[in-house]
Amino acid sequence: MLSKRLFPYSNLFPRSRKYKFIVYFIICLTIIISALGVYLYSIPIVSPNQPQCDMVWMSPSYARIRAFDETHTKYASKYNLYLYREQDVDKMPNENENEDGNEGFTSLDGIPALFIHGNAGSFEQVRSIAARCSEMYYNDGRFKEKYPHARNIDFFTADFNEELSAFKGLRDQVEYVTQAISFIVDLYPQNPNRNIILIGHSMGGLVARIAASRQQHESNVDIILTLATPHSDPFPWLPKTSDFPDEVGLISIYSSVDLMVPPSVVTPKSKSDHFFSVDAAKLLGVPIDHQGIVWCGQLREKLSEALIGISGLNTLQDRMKVFKKIFSGDRKELGPTPIFGLAKLKLKLLQSWVHLLSLTIFALKWTIIVLAIIQLRKVYTKFNNPPPTH
């Protein structure tokens, strides 16, 4: 009788069964989710029979612009600036310094363009588009007939030493690019418009946008071409780009199968009057990943033609017309990248990481705020209700 009173088994067993059910449920749910994850991982996003990007070849060379030193920017010891030259095609700069110390770069007679690589990227990623532009202008007579006012393009490229711009260094890169724009434009005194084309890949597109907003009073930038750039400011810790000037044209090229920068973040929250975007994977009918967007053969053909087409035009309206004509032309023979069923589900899940990260940061921020308010309330209550004295 005593043991029954001390240990009420009738109350303990139901609770034990309840806990076991919860444990079993969690284990089964984990197994199901893991099995589903393994199964989805084994499913290819695109069919192996799907047409792929054409491989490209070039003969790159890079001339470092040492004249862009500490007298022009305090980041000269941290970053570098190069001029791309396609071997046996482009005119090589004179290695002998002139009286200005610009190593012969003042003899350049083309249209300047500045390439800005992305997070942990390389300045050499400019080579694919730059090489094709040189071939089109110097060796392909079709484009000279199609664009009689075209000029050759001098591609400059910024080297951030593979810096993680998605997490740090973005502000330094913006200041460096802003100063580089002014330096490059001064190399072209014969250019009456003093304009430069900015090309940014991934986070480099954000650097270009912010730098262009700082250059607004000088009007050195009138068009920006971005490749797989998250324009909607998905990362709260980075500088915002909402102050983008309306006088600058913005072309956003992205891929619907990009896992790093999904289509949901490629459109800026506040569009300018001259904004244009296109899904390159859908337009060309080939899967293009985040890195492939700078070298994919089919895409670089259109990008290079567009750049050659706008090189001899002076007004922003005319330049935007060229881009829209090339990227919104006849699509009868082209089609979307075929992704259906579970492959599409896998793609959406993999692309949702940006939104999950934003929600996590949002939840952490408000958790810290609520905890701080609770602690302040406790302190306030403690000081306004002192303990009674005896």
From Swiss-Prot:
GO molecular function, one term: phosphatidylinositol deacylase activity
Annotated Pfam families: PGAP1
Domain of life, per lineage: Eukaryota
EC number: 3.1.-.-
Record GO cellular component, one term: endoplasmic reticulum membrane
UniProt subcellular location: Endoplasmic reticulum membrane
PANTHER family: GPI INOSITOL-DEACYLASE, NEGATIVE REGULATOR OF VESICLE FORMATION-RELATED
Protein name: GPI inositol-deacylase
Species assigned in the record: Candida albicans (strain SC5314 / ATCC MYA-2876) (Yeast)
